[in-house]
From Swiss-Prot:
Signal peptide: none annotated. InterPro entries: AAA+_ATPase (IPR003593), DNA_recomb/repair_Rad51_C (IPR013632), DNA_recomb/repair_RadA (IPR011938), DNA_recomb/repair_RecA-like (IPR016467), DNA_repair_Rad51/TF_NusA_a-hlx (IPR010995), P-loop_NTPase (IPR027417), RecA_ATP-bd (IPR020588), RecA_monomer-monomer_interface (IPR020587). The lineage of its organism: Archaea, Thermoproteota, Thermoprotei, Desulfurococcales, Desulfurococcaceae. Belongs to the eukaryotic RecA-like protein family. This is DNA repair and recombination protein RadA. It comes from the Archaea. Keywords: ATP-binding, DNA damage, DNA recombination, DNA-binding, Nucleotide-binding. ATP binds at residues 111-118. Coiled coil: none annotated.
């Protein structure tokens, strides 16, 4: 069995994958062992037209080749030492997050318009390119823009703020506008190949829910919306885990009419979104350029809040 694992280096090496099946897999975006291993047999069958039993064998073989199997708690401890962190630019915010934005997990930033979600995403797209001793990962970023909020001018300012060449920084950020929810899902499918080959260390989806909300309004469409959103979030979770990248998603808030005390807002997306991110951060406006960040859900972090500032040069501590 160990011999077989060594021999399987490519999808064409998988048992049962001849030229025709390989072509179908590649056309559906399954160009790497990782992409196949991260999918369900149902997803592979649906996307390629391959019978479900064949898809099951192909997925199982890809997982075995990549040694996706039971691990001991000690293995997990060793793996956790490979988790890296990207600085936000604010020491306060980094401390709240246990050192910065983590790889191998999804971090959700949610809050109302103007609370700083997109500003942090821009800053992280710059900071991920910094050397590790400056809080970066010396990697590239992918920015999936669903609402047209990305601004290259802001990237330019932030790059200057951390002493990097703005043009070089912009060349290392791959931007794409997602035009609808199915396109958004297809983009992430493609990332399983792109991330592996291009030193990408950060994937931003800003915002993760807007297309799903617009395309599936009302209670009658809720089940379909949640099902698609669930698939999308699991794609992102697998991407983060398999390739050790940081995934940051933004989300809007909606008012809860049943809440009379405290903050009457909650993140859009219901229980599906509530369980997917590893870290959930609620952002809200304060006075002037100050913003408040609160960790509301993270198994490894205490709940708490802090203040940061949005300055001309980017995310910083308040003066």
């Amino acid at each position: 069995m160990g011999e077989d694992k060594r021999e399987i280096k490519d999808i064409t090496d998988l048992p049962g994958v001849g030229p025709t099946t390989a072509q179908k897999l590649m056309e559906a975006g399954y160009t790497t062992l990782e992409a196949i291993a991260a999918a369900t047999p149902q997803e592979v069958s649906q996307a390629t037209g391959i019978p479900i039993l064949t898809a099951q064998k192909i997925v199982d073989a890809a997982r075995e080749a990549l040694n996706i199997d039971f691990k001991t708690a000690y293995d997990l401890k060793i793996e956790s030492m490979n988790i890296k962190k990207i600085t936000t630019g604010s020491r306060n915010l980094d401390e709240l997050l246990g050192g910065g934005i983590e790889t191998k997990t999804i971090t959700e930033l949610f809050g109302e318009f103007g609370s700083g979600k997109t500003q942090i995403c821009h800053q992280l797209s710059v900071n991920v390119q910094l050397p590790e001793d400056k809080g970066g990962l010396e990697g590239k970023a992918v920015y999936v823009d669903t609402e047209g909020t990305f601004r290259w001018e802001r990237i330019e300012q932030m790059a200057r703020g951390v002493g990097l060449d703005p043009d070089e920084v912009m060349k290392n950020i791959y931007w794409i506008r997602a035009i609808n929810s199915h396109h958004q899902i297809a983009i992430v499918d493609k990332l399983f190949t792109m991330v592996k080959n291009d030193n990408i260390k950060l994937v931003v989806v800003d915002s993760v829910t807007s297309h799903f909300r617009a395309e599936f309004p009302g209670r009658e469409n809720l089940a379909m919306r949640q099902q698609l959103l669930n698939r999308h979030l699991h794609q992102l979770m697998r991407l983060a885990d398999i390739f050790n990248v940081a995934v940051v998603i933004t989300n809007q808030v909606m008012a809860r009419p049943d809440v009379f005390y405290g903050d009457p807002t909650q993140a859009v997306g219901g229980h599906v979104l509530g369980h997917a991110p590893g870290v959930r951060v609620y952002l809200k406006k304060s006075r002037g350029n100050k913003r408040i960040a609160r960790v509301v859900d993270a198994p490894h972090l205490p709940e708490g809040e802090t203040v940061f500032a949005i300055t001309e040069w980017g995310i910083r501590d308040p003066e």
